Amino acid sequence: MLSHRLGASARRMPHLDAGTDAGQNAPPMSAPPTPPPPLIDVCALSFARRDEPVFGPLSFTLAAGQIVLIEGDNGSGKTTLLRVLAGLLQPDSGSACILGAAPGSEAARAQMATLGHLLGLKGDLTVLENLRLGMALYGCRAGADVRAVLDQVGLDGYADEPVRTLSAGQKKRTALARLALLPARLWLLDEPYANLDRAGIGVVNALLDAHAAAGGGALVSSHGAVGFHQGVASTLRLQA
Protein backbone atom coordinates (compact mmCIF):
# COMPACT_ATOMS: atom_id res chain seq x y z
CA MET A 1 0.00 0.00 0.00
CA LEU A 2 2.84 2.37 0.80
CA SER A 3 4.48 1.86 -2.57
CA HIS A 4 1.13 2.40 -4.30
CA ARG A 5 0.64 5.75 -2.62
CA LEU A 6 4.13 6.88 -3.58
CA GLY A 7 3.45 5.93 -7.16
CA ALA A 8 0.23 7.92 -7.19
CA SER A 9 2.03 10.96 -5.86
CA ALA A 10 4.71 10.60 -8.50
CA ARG A 11 2.13 10.53 -11.25
CA ARG A 12 0.75 13.85 -10.07
CA MET A 13 4.16 15.62 -10.19
CA PRO A 14 4.95 17.64 -13.37
CA HIS A 15 7.53 16.04 -15.61
CA LEU A 16 10.60 18.24 -16.18
CA ASP A 17 13.71 17.37 -18.14
CA ALA A 18 16.73 19.19 -19.47
CA GLY A 19 15.02 19.99 -22.77
CA THR A 20 12.15 21.94 -21.20
CA ASP A 21 12.46 25.65 -20.40
CA ALA A 22 9.47 27.47 -18.98
CA GLY A 23 10.70 30.68 -20.57
CA GLN A 24 10.60 29.21 -24.09
CA ASN A 25 6.83 29.58 -24.30
CA ALA A 26 6.68 33.06 -22.76
CA PRO A 27 5.70 35.87 -25.13
CA PRO A 28 8.64 37.95 -26.38
CA MET A 29 9.33 41.07 -24.38
CA SER A 30 8.22 44.20 -26.19
CA ALA A 31 10.62 47.06 -26.69
CA PRO A 32 10.23 49.94 -24.23
CA PRO A 33 7.99 52.72 -25.56
CA THR A 34 9.70 55.53 -27.39
CA PRO A 35 9.76 58.61 -25.17
CA PRO A 36 7.81 61.58 -26.52
CA PRO A 37 9.82 64.39 -28.10
CA PRO A 38 10.58 67.40 -25.91
CA LEU A 39 8.25 70.36 -26.22
CA ILE A 40 11.21 72.42 -27.47
CA ASP A 41 14.48 71.08 -28.88
CA VAL A 42 16.98 73.76 -29.93
CA CYS A 43 20.45 73.10 -31.35
CA ALA A 44 23.00 75.84 -32.13
CA LEU A 45 20.24 78.31 -32.94
CA SER A 46 21.31 81.86 -33.82
CA PHE A 47 19.76 84.99 -35.29
CA ALA A 48 21.31 88.15 -36.71
CA ARG A 49 19.86 91.42 -37.91
CA ARG A 50 21.77 93.34 -40.60
CA ASP A 51 24.71 91.04 -39.99
CA GLU A 52 24.73 91.97 -36.29
CA PRO A 53 24.24 88.96 -33.97
CA VAL A 54 21.10 89.18 -31.83
CA PHE A 55 21.46 85.88 -30.00
CA GLY A 56 23.15 82.53 -30.25
CA PRO A 57 24.25 80.01 -30.83
CA LEU A 58 21.83 78.52 -28.28
CA SER A 59 21.16 74.86 -27.48
CA PHE A 60 18.55 73.73 -24.96
CA THR A 61 15.52 71.50 -24.47
CA LEU A 62 12.25 72.00 -22.64
CA ALA A 63 10.42 68.85 -21.55
CA ALA A 64 6.83 68.36 -20.47
CA GLY A 65 6.32 69.62 -16.94
CA GLN A 66 9.17 72.16 -17.15
CA ILE A 67 9.34 75.94 -16.99
CA VAL A 68 12.39 77.60 -18.53
CA LEU A 69 13.21 81.26 -17.95
CA ILE A 70 14.83 83.54 -20.54
CA GLU A 71 16.60 86.31 -18.68
CA GLY A 72 18.40 89.32 -20.10
CA ASP A 73 18.47 93.07 -20.49
CA ASN A 74 16.49 94.93 -23.11
CA GLY A 75 17.95 94.23 -26.53
CA SER A 76 19.43 90.86 -25.56
CA GLY A 77 17.14 88.93 -27.94
CA LYS A 78 14.49 87.50 -25.60
CA THR A 79 11.54 88.54 -27.74
CA THR A 80 13.37 87.63 -30.94
CA LEU A 81 14.03 84.10 -29.67
CA LEU A 82 10.36 83.64 -28.85
CA ARG A 83 9.38 84.92 -32.30
CA VAL A 84 11.78 82.46 -33.95
CA LEU A 85 10.31 79.57 -31.97
CA ALA A 86 6.80 80.72 -32.88
CA GLY A 87 7.76 80.57 -36.56
CA LEU A 88 7.45 84.34 -37.09
CA LEU A 89 11.16 84.81 -37.86
CA GLN A 90 13.67 82.54 -39.58
CA PRO A 91 16.97 81.81 -37.79
CA ASP A 92 20.31 82.36 -39.49
CA SER A 93 21.67 78.98 -38.41
CA GLY A 94 20.90 76.01 -36.22
CA SER A 95 17.64 74.15 -35.76
CA ALA A 96 14.55 74.17 -33.57
CA CYS A 97 11.71 71.67 -33.17
CA ILE A 98 8.38 72.22 -31.43
CA LEU A 99 7.00 68.85 -30.30
CA GLY A 100 8.96 67.28 -33.15
CA ALA A 101 7.65 69.72 -35.77
CA ALA A 102 9.13 72.78 -37.45
CA PRO A 103 8.33 76.16 -35.86
CA GLY A 104 5.43 77.79 -37.64
CA SER A 105 4.11 74.51 -39.02
CA GLU A 106 0.48 73.61 -38.54
CA ALA A 107 1.46 70.80 -36.16
CA ALA A 108 3.51 73.19 -34.02
CA ARG A 109 0.88 75.94 -33.98
CA ALA A 110 -1.79 73.49 -32.86
CA GLN A 111 0.18 72.76 -29.67
CA MET A 112 1.43 76.26 -28.86
CA ALA A 113 0.02 79.45 -27.34
CA THR A 114 1.80 82.79 -27.12
CA LEU A 115 1.40 85.86 -24.95
CA GLY A 116 3.33 89.01 -25.82
CA HIS A 117 3.30 92.76 -25.35
CA LEU A 118 0.29 93.04 -27.68
CA LEU A 119 -2.47 91.12 -25.91
CA GLY A 120 -4.78 90.69 -28.92
CA LEU A 121 -7.93 91.63 -27.01
CA LYS A 122 -10.99 93.27 -28.56
CA GLY A 123 -11.67 96.47 -26.63
CA ASP A 124 -15.35 96.71 -27.56
CA LEU A 125 -16.04 93.15 -26.41
CA THR A 126 -16.56 92.20 -22.79
CA VAL A 127 -14.10 90.08 -20.85
CA LEU A 128 -16.33 87.03 -21.27
CA GLU A 129 -16.83 87.68 -24.99
CA ASN A 130 -13.06 87.89 -25.50
CA LEU A 131 -12.60 84.54 -23.77
CA ARG A 132 -15.34 82.92 -25.83
CA LEU A 133 -13.83 84.32 -29.01
CA GLY A 134 -10.46 82.80 -28.10
CA MET A 135 -12.06 79.41 -27.47
CA ALA A 136 -13.97 79.59 -30.75
CA LEU A 137 -10.77 80.32 -32.69
CA TYR A 138 -8.28 78.08 -30.90
CA GLY A 139 -10.25 75.49 -28.94
CA CYS A 140 -10.67 74.91 -25.25
CA ARG A 141 -8.85 72.83 -22.66
CA ALA A 142 -10.81 69.73 -21.60
CA GLY A 143 -12.85 70.39 -18.48
CA ALA A 144 -12.17 74.13 -18.54
CA ASP A 145 -14.59 76.29 -16.54
CA VAL A 146 -14.65 79.90 -17.72
CA ARG A 147 -16.10 81.30 -14.50
CA ALA A 148 -13.59 79.38 -12.39
CA VAL A 149 -10.70 80.70 -14.50
CA LEU A 150 -11.97 84.28 -14.15
CA ASP A 151 -12.01 83.81 -10.40
CA GLN A 152 -8.51 82.31 -10.53
CA VAL A 153 -7.06 85.38 -12.26
CA GLY A 154 -8.90 87.82 -10.01
CA LEU A 155 -11.55 88.95 -12.49
CA ASP A 156 -14.61 87.54 -10.77
CA GLY A 157 -17.32 90.15 -11.28
CA TYR A 158 -15.70 91.60 -14.42
CA ALA A 159 -17.08 89.12 -16.96
CA ASP A 160 -19.50 91.64 -18.49
CA GLU A 161 -17.14 94.64 -18.44
CA PRO A 162 -15.92 95.93 -21.83
CA VAL A 163 -12.18 95.36 -22.06
CA ARG A 164 -11.56 98.99 -23.06
CA THR A 165 -12.67 100.09 -19.57
CA LEU A 166 -10.13 97.88 -17.76
CA SER A 167 -6.77 98.89 -16.34
CA ALA A 168 -3.55 97.62 -17.93
CA GLY A 169 -3.22 94.98 -15.22
CA GLN A 170 -6.81 93.80 -15.67
CA LYS A 171 -6.29 93.52 -19.42
CA LYS A 172 -3.21 91.38 -18.76
CA ARG A 173 -5.29 89.19 -16.42
CA THR A 174 -7.92 88.81 -19.17
CA ALA A 175 -5.21 87.63 -21.56
CA LEU A 176 -3.93 85.22 -18.90
CA ALA A 177 -7.45 83.82 -18.45
CA ARG A 178 -7.69 83.25 -22.21
CA LEU A 179 -4.31 81.49 -22.12
CA ALA A 180 -5.41 79.20 -19.28
CA LEU A 181 -8.48 78.10 -21.25
CA LEU A 182 -6.59 77.06 -24.38
CA PRO A 183 -5.60 73.41 -25.03
CA ALA A 184 -1.98 74.24 -26.01
CA ARG A 185 0.75 72.19 -24.30
CA LEU A 186 3.49 74.77 -24.87
CA TRP A 187 3.32 78.37 -23.71
CA LEU A 188 5.67 81.05 -25.06
CA LEU A 189 5.30 84.03 -22.72
CA ASP A 190 7.03 87.36 -23.35
CA GLU A 191 7.24 89.47 -20.17
CA PRO A 192 4.06 88.06 -18.57
CA TYR A 193 4.77 89.95 -15.32
CA ALA A 194 4.61 93.39 -16.97
CA ASN A 195 1.82 95.68 -15.67
CA LEU A 196 1.03 93.33 -12.78
CA ASP A 197 1.11 94.02 -9.06
CA ARG A 198 2.31 91.51 -6.48
CA ALA A 199 -1.04 89.68 -6.55
CA GLY A 200 -0.95 89.54 -10.35
CA ILE A 201 2.56 88.10 -10.28
CA GLY A 202 1.22 85.39 -7.98
CA VAL A 203 -1.52 84.68 -10.54
CA VAL A 204 1.07 84.14 -13.28
CA ASN A 205 3.08 81.79 -11.08
CA ALA A 206 -0.01 79.80 -10.09
CA LEU A 207 -1.03 79.38 -13.74
CA LEU A 208 2.49 78.27 -14.66
CA ASP A 209 2.56 75.73 -11.84
CA ALA A 210 -0.84 74.29 -12.81
CA HIS A 211 0.13 74.11 -16.48
CA ALA A 212 3.39 72.30 -15.71
CA ALA A 213 1.65 69.91 -13.30
CA ALA A 214 -0.78 68.98 -16.09
CA GLY A 215 2.10 68.01 -18.40
CA GLY A 216 2.53 71.31 -20.20
CA GLY A 217 5.62 73.46 -20.42
CA ALA A 218 6.47 77.13 -20.70
CA LEU A 219 9.30 79.29 -22.00
CA VAL A 220 9.08 82.62 -20.18
CA SER A 221 11.02 85.82 -20.78
CA SER A 222 11.42 88.30 -17.96
CA HIS A 223 13.49 91.45 -17.59
CA GLY A 224 15.42 90.81 -14.40
CA ALA A 225 13.18 87.84 -13.52
CA VAL A 226 11.05 90.07 -11.30
CA GLY A 227 8.64 87.92 -9.32
CA PHE A 228 9.67 84.66 -10.94
CA HIS A 229 9.10 81.73 -8.61
CA GLN A 230 11.48 78.92 -7.76
CA GLY A 231 9.85 76.24 -9.93
CA VAL A 232 12.00 77.12 -12.94
CA ALA A 233 13.85 74.13 -14.39
CA SER A 234 16.66 76.17 -15.95
CA THR A 235 17.56 79.71 -17.00
CA LEU A 236 18.79 80.99 -20.36
CA ARG A 237 20.79 84.17 -19.85
CA LEU A 238 21.09 86.28 -22.99
CA GLN A 239 23.61 89.08 -23.31
CA ALA A 240 22.81 92.31 -25.14
Segments predicted by a language model, with ranges:
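Conserved ABC ATPase signature
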Residues: 162-166
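Conserved ABC ATPase "signature" region
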Residues: 132, 143-158
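Q-loop/switch helix immediately C-terminal to the Walker
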Residues: 118, 123-139
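Helix-to-loop junction immediately C-terminal to a conserved catalytic motif
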Residues: 86
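Catalytic Walker B motif of ABC-type/P-loop ATPase nucleotide-binding domains
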Residues: 187-191
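Conserved ABC transporter NBD signature motif
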Residues: 94-110
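Hydrophobic anchor residue at the start of the ABC signature
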Residues: 176, 215
